């Protein structure tokens, strides 16, 4: 019998708290085995439109699918399922599982995990519905549950697909006819004028009622439906989705948060990106057989929301200027640089698909970089200029035109001397998502300077070995200096190597 999960709360972006259920260690082991079995059964049949909690899929693959398949979209349904994970019906889920799994004991084990309940403030509560977020099997159970919705949407997409291509736009055809006549008469100037007018209107009728497409992408409980068609069609599909959710899955589609948006007028927020549609008619490219065609009209663009950059910059700005982070002053310089690098690298790695990633990240990078320099300057009671002079390292420019000076640090390792500078990689847009990330646990868990000194098992004050150690923080070097000056005794050797911040003692 599984133990009740421990309930903890983590903050959400909107200020509310998200409940998580942390299973006991023994239950985690069993859940992992169950997860692997379920993945082997269901992964081959899951929809290509589902991207959440699946191998080799991510937010990037979901966004790339929207960008590559939804060109010309008029309307977007932004789907929001009210408390999806908390309202999954156990009986419906087990019924869905029984369609593919003919093993009563295995299904009973899953039922026990679902009914195990949770502990909060040492009091047990029963689980009447939902899969607790935080459990190892919860994501795949949610995907299995919502796979029924994926199949429903694939049916909707096939049902509403009409026509092979849009009909020609009448005004465009008239101008094309006039241009051809002008060229035959030798009036090239008039023909060029007609061409300019043609470039400002669509070649195909964007409101063709006989051409319709419906595309659907889901990541966990967030989904979007991209529609080439009328608003009436979008409203009809929205009502059918709400009806299916309520009748078949006992889930509720939020009437307030589920919106229908005209992509020509307003951007859609999905997975942290903003989705918009390009309206440029004049840019042209030449295809593989030499024909000119419009390059961007109607294409889907992914952009970085402006409020994301402003929110990320809050810890590093004060009164509109770069500002130091006081909580990092006590860290060694190499760890300060490492933390700043991790922040900007993480931000870029997530938004690398955005069209404007270079512009937005350059703005972030300026304030972030000088915040790092000011943090080091405060640590060493110095100035920005002196920090750049002391830690500046000349590195080659990306375009090959000379060098540039970036703050960094040189350090020694077993493999030899190495250099760490502030993040200087290219901030260009990435056209396609990267493949599966390789196992990085070794790098994540290797620890910093403090872990190495603790693991050395030696007291830095008296040299005692093989004893329990803890880290003592030395806040201000000047206080130590005053103390030993008053005593008239020399300062011990441990003061200088520890960068004035930490000391390992029994």
Regions picked out by a protein language model, each given a short descriptive name:
Residues 39-49:
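Charged boundary/loop elements
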Residues 2-8, 48-49, 54-57, 61-253, ...:
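Conserved polymerase palm-domain catalytic core
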Residues 459-462:
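Short cysteine-rich clusters marking metal-coordination/redox-active sites
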Residues 201-212, 327-331, 443-446, 489-490:
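Active-site-adjacent structural elements in folded domains
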Residues 228-236, 246-248, 269-457:
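Active-site and adjacent loop segments of nucleotide-processing enzymes
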Residues 25-35, 43, 67:
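Duplex nucleic acid-engaging cores and interfaces of nucleic-acid transaction enzymes
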Residues 501-506:
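Conserved small/polar residues in nucleotide/adenosyl-binding loops
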């Amino acid at each position: 019998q599984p133990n009740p999960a421990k309930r903890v709360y983590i903050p959400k972006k909107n200020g509310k708290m998200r409940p998580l259920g942390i299973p006991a260690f023994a239950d985690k082991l069993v859940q992992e085995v169950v997860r692997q079995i379920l993945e082997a059964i269901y992964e081959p049949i899951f929809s290509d439109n589902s991207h959440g909690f699946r191998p080799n899929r991510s937010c990037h693959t979901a966004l790339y699918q929207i960008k590559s398949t939804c060109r010309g979209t008029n309307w977007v349904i932004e789907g929001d399922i009210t408390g999806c994970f908390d309202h999954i019906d156990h009986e419906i889920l087990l019924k869905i599982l029984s369609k593919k799994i003919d093993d009563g004991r295995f299904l009973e084990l899953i039922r026990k995990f679902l009914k195990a309940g949770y502990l909060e403030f040492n009091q047990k509560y029963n689980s009447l519905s939902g899969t607790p977020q935080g459990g190892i099997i919860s994501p795949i159970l949610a995907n299995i549950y919502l796979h029924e919705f994926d199949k429903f949407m694939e049916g909707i997409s096939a049902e509403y697909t009409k026509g092979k291509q849009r009909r020609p736009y009448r005004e465009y055809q008239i101008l094309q006819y006039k241009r051809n006549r002008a060229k035959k008469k030798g009036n090239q100037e008039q023909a060029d004028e007609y061409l300019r007018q043609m470039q400002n209107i669509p070649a195909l009728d964007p409101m063709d009622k006989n051409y319709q497409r419906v595309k659907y992408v889901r990541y966990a409980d967030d989904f979007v439906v991209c529609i080439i068609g009328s608003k009436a069609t979008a409203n009809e599909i929205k009502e059918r989705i709400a009806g299916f959710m309520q009748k078949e899955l006992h889930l509720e589609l939020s009437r307030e948060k589920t919106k229908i948006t005209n992509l020509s007028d307003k951007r859609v927020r999905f997975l942290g990106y903003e989705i918009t549609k390009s309206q440029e008619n004049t840019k042209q490219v030449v295809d593989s057989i030499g024909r000119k065609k419009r390059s961007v009209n109607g294409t889907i663009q992914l952009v970085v929301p402006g409020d994301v950059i402003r929110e990320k910059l809050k810890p590093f700005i004060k009164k509109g200027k770069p500002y130091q982070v006081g909580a990092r002053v006590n860290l060694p310089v190499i760890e300060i640089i490492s933390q700043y690098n991790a922040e900007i690298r993480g931000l870029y790695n997530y938004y690398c698909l955005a069209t404007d990633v270079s512009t937005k990240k350059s703005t972030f990078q300026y304030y972030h970089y000088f915040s790092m320099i000011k943090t080091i300057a405060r640590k060493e009671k110095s100035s920005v200029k002196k920090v750049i002079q002391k830690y500046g390292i000349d590195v080659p420019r990306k375009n090959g035109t000379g060098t540039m000076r970036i703050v960094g640090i040189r350090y020694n390792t077993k493999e030899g001397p190495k250099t760490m500078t502030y993040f200087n990689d290219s901030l260009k847009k990435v056209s396609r998502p990267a493949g599966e990330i390789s196992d990085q646990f070794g790098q994540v868990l290797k620890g910093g300077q403090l872990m190495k000194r603790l693991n050395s098992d030696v007291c830095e004050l008296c040299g005692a070995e093989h004893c329990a150690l803890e880290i003592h923080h030395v806040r201000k070097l000047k206080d130590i200096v005053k103390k030993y000056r008053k005593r008239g005794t020399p300062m011990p050797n441990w003061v200088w190597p520890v960068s004035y911040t930490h000391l390992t003692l029994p």
